Curated annotation (Swiss-Prot):
Domain of life: Eukaryota
Gene that encodes it: ADAM7
Chain positions listed as propeptide in the UniProt record: 19-176
Linked pathology: Has been found to be frequently mutated in melanoma. ADAM7 mutations may play a role in melanoma progression and metastasis. Expressed in melanoma cells but not in healthy melanocytes.
Keywords: Disulfide bond, Glycoprotein, Membrane, Signal, Transmembrane, Transmembrane helix
Source organism of the structure: Homo sapiens
Entry keyword Transmembrane helix: yes
Consequence the record notes for mutating R31C: In a cutaneous metastatic melanoma sample; somatic mutation
UniProt entry tagged with the keyword Disulfide bond: yes
Subcellular location as annotated: Membrane
GO cellular component annotations of the record: cell surface; plasma membrane
Protein name, per record: Disintegrin and metalloproteinase domain-containing protein 7
Annotated phenotype, changing H243Y: In a cutaneous metastatic melanoma sample; somatic mutation; does not affect cell growth but conferes reduced cell adhesion to laminin-1
Residues linked to a glycan: N84, N167, N174, N184, N584, N668
Lipid bilayer topology: Single-pass type I membrane protein
């Protein structure tokens, strides 16, 4: 017994020493015990039943740590691998080989500690338990004991007060992203700006030759290391409703594909160019990370472009992979991704309750939470730059059909779903049962406050400008009603423009958005350039052919500005110098052509005024009456009804929209009653006419023969009267059926109304 213990301690020395270098301490030997599951969390639906799974969807492990028994509750990660996942390696000759393994099974989990409200875990069960878990502000690292067959594991405690030997610092390139202008807000725009709407970052990771040599034998060793990192990053970002999904890895086996300079900034520029020109030709992704095992002669451990998500060249990061602890590297990856999503370093008073934040500048220990400052910066970034690539869902259409409590989807039988217990921060929802807590009426929504539905008439979405309406709660739903705005064509900005889809587009504002606040609209003479029919002057683009503007439409083609600066990020600008014959002066006419946008935002925005009662629409200057449909809103509110863009009555602020709905409801009932009465009367008349006709026929049968009767045809204006020799009976005609006429325009007597 004693020799065995001594031998085990000898084996543990290098493993423990390695962790001390990283700054962890207080190791403890544990033997995790797998527990049987008492109940399943799913709702009875099956998923991929035809596939034999090696790893279970849900696990429970008991760990005795510091004289306390912890129960680790783990759920298999479902969203950190994309359905189009690929792996690329290189031969000795430099040839790229790409495979698309159908990964139907993996051993990566996320979870929490049972009965510990503020806890989280990111664990791999591939060969024992390996990963990270947290209880309140204390963080732990667990991994199997090397060369042990008895199931022993080591648990290390991160010391929050001792900085790491390899302390973290990062840098950002000097890069400023311009806000994205647009002629109107699309459904995509509203989704990307929605804080509660789920977003997806399709992540691609490249490992350089040094990382491969250190971890790449066999290949699945490096793969599992990268998967563990992404599982950790995904766990962190799910708190922001972002799913970080790995869509591919590329391993630079045998040699690096770019020169890794001693300057990390130069290396980032070189890598950005390579991934755009080479990697993007064979794989689609939102963000790419280079894991480099080289020191790069710098204390900086990571670098990225601030706010570069979804942009060509700029959605790129580099992380130094110099430490064996994947959680530290993953935390740095999450940190750099935060910069790419518009987040800055946290400085006092931006703090997190659990101590460290993801965006702390030192990044010395794993952090799982974002400060309020980081969250606000991210939400502002969504509004300003609209990174629409984050709306693409990298999973099959039926991926979310697997229903269970904790998937953040409101499935059948659920009143709320705030995600797994370790992620749920909603005080209104019971994360274990997915029902509202006693006494509460709602869990989320603009009309939900303190877990109760707001009263009718409360403003849930204030008016953005003079072309918008404030939305008010209905009193019976936690959701804010659909956004309504003033009817298209309503004069705005002192009659300089007309309202269009809730905005007041003008050329002055568009010039400011394209360039900067110093830019203004140029002289009218510039718009003659739109008759040229090239990329800097046209009205319509059909199959990449630039069609020149007609004379009446020149103010609806490319916009021309003067002053201001253009970021090279958007595209190239062109300045023409034209002579103003009236003032004998030179006029500057500046416009823009985008490199990579499908919609040319250099065209005059739709809805922009191009004359009195005229607006631009698809490169034409048209009368508003032809473009917009308006409505005279009846008095459906208590007072002051206004036309809305959806041809609906919109109540003024302070009135509950219920008043509109009730009035419309009464109106609809009144119309229905009138229609029913008319139908009943019509049926009654029809019955009487049929009975009358039967009576006439009966009299004709019973009466003795009489001489022929002549009847004057009142609908005939000829020289002779028409004589009928048969009984005259009333006939039934549809009220809207016109009498037929002969070639002279005279009505047929048989078709005349009786």
């Amino acid at each position: 017994m004693l020799p065995g213990c001594i031998f085990l301690m000898i084996l543990l020395i290098p493993q423990v020493k390695e962790k001390f270098i990283l700054g962890v301490e207080g190791q403890q030997l544990v033997r995790p015990k797998k527990l049987p599951l008492i109940q399943k969390r799913d709702t009875g639906h099956t998923h991929d039943d035809d596939i034999l799974k090696t790893y279970e969807e849900e696990l429970l492990y008991e760990i005795k740590l510091n004289r306390k028994t912890l129960v680790l509750h783990l759920l298999r990660s479902r969203e950190f691998l994309g359905s189009n996942y690929s792996e690329t390696f290189y031969s000795m000759k430099g040839e790229a080989f790409t495979r698309h393994p159908q990964i139907m099974d993996h051993c990566f989990y996320q979870g929490s500690i049972v009965h510990e409200y503020d806890s989280a875990a990111s664990i791999s069960t591939c060969n024992g338990l390996r990963g990270f878990f947290r209880i309140n502000d204390q963080r732990y690292l667990i991994e199997p004991v090397k060369y042990s067959d008895e199931g022993e594991h080591l648990v290390f405690k991160y010391n929050l007060r001792v900085p790491y030997g390899a302390n973290y610092s990062c840098t950002e390139l000097n890069f400023t992203r311009k806000t994205v202008p647009g002629d109107n807000e699309s459904e995509e725009d509203s989704k990307i700006k929605g804080i509660h709407d789920e977003k997806y970052v399709e992540l691609f990771i490249v490992a350089d030759d040094t990382v491969y040599r250190r971890n790449g034998h066999p290949h699945n060793k490096l793969r599992n290391r990268i998967w563990g990192m992404v599982n950790f990053v995904n766990m962190i970002y799910k708190t922001l409703n972002i799913h970080v999904t790995l869509v591919g890895i590329e391993i630079w086996t045998h040699e690096d594909k770019i020169e890794l300079y001693s300057n990390i900034e130069t290396t980032l520029l070189r890598f950005s160019f390579w991934q755009e020109k080479i990697l993007k030709t064979r794989k689609d992704f939102d963000h790419v990370v280079l894991l480099s095992g080289k020191w790069l002669y710098s204390h900086v451990q990571g670098i990225s472009y601030p706010g570069g998500m979804c942009l060509p060249y700029y959605s790129t990061s580099i992380i130094k992979d110099l430490l064996p602890d994947t959680n530290i590297i993953a935390n740095r990856m999450a940190h750099q991704l935060g910069h790419n999503l518009g987040m800055q370093h946290d400085e006092f008073p931006c703090t997190c309750p659990s101590g460290k934040c993801v965006m702390d500048s030192d990044g010395s220990i794993p952090a799982l939470k974002f400060s309020k400052c980081s969250q606000n910066q991210y939400h502002q970034y969504l509004k300003d730059y609209k990174p629409t690539c984050m709306l693409n869902i990298p999973f099959p259409y039926n991926f979310h059909d697997f229903q269970f409590c904790g998937n953040k989807k409101l499935d059948e039988g659920e009143e709320c779903d705030c995600g797994p217990a370790q992620e749920c921060t909603n005080p209104c929802c019971d994360a274990h049962t997915c029902v509202l807590k006693p006494g509460f009426t709602c869990a989320e929504g603009e009309c939900c406050e303190s877990c109760q539905i707001k009263k009718a008439g409360s403003i849930c979405r204030p008016a953005k400008d003079e072309c918008d309406f404030p939305e008010m709660c209905t009193g019976h739903s936690p959701a804010c009603p659909k956004d309504q705005f003033r009817v298209n064509g309503f004069p705005c900005k002192n009659s300089e423009g007309y309202c269009f889809m809730g905005k007041c587009p003008t050329r002055e504002d568009q010039c400011s958005e394209l360039f900067d606040d110093e830019a203004i609209e140029s002289h009218d003479i510039c718009y003659k350039m739109n008759t040229k029919g090239n990329k800097f002057g046209y009205c319509k683009n059909k199959e990449n052919r630039f069609l020149p503007c007609e004379e009446k439409d020149v103010r609806c083609g490319k916009i021309y500005c003067t002053g201001g600066e253009l970021s090279s990020l958007l595209g190239e600008d062109k300045t023409y110098h034209l002579k103003d014959p009236q003032k004998n002066a030179t006029v500057k006419c500046k416009t823009i052509f985008l490199y990579h946008d499908s919609t040319d935002i250099g065209l005059v925005a739709s809805g922009t005024k191009c004359g009195e009662g005229m607006v631009c629409n698809n490169g034409e200057c048209l009368n508003m009456e032809k473009v917009y449909i308006s409505t005279n809103c009846p008095s459906q509110c208590n007072e002051n009804p206004v036309d809305g863009h959806g041809l609906q009555c919109h109540c003024e602020e302070g009135q509950a929209p219920v008043a509109c709905e009730e009035t419309l409801h009464v109106t609809n009932i009144t119309i229905l009653v009138v229609v029913l009465v008319l139908v009943i009367v019509g049926i009654g008349v029809l019955i009487l006419l049929v009975r009358y006709r039967k009576c006439i026929k009966l009299k004709q049968v019973q009466s003795p023969p009489t001489e022929t009767l002549g009847v004057e045809n009142k609908g005939y204006f000829g020289d002779e009267q028409q004589i009928r020799t048969e009984p005259i009976l009333p006939e039934i005609h549809f009220l809207n059926k016109p009498a037929s006429k002969d070639s002279r325009g005279i009505a047929d007597p048989n078709q005349s109304a009786k």
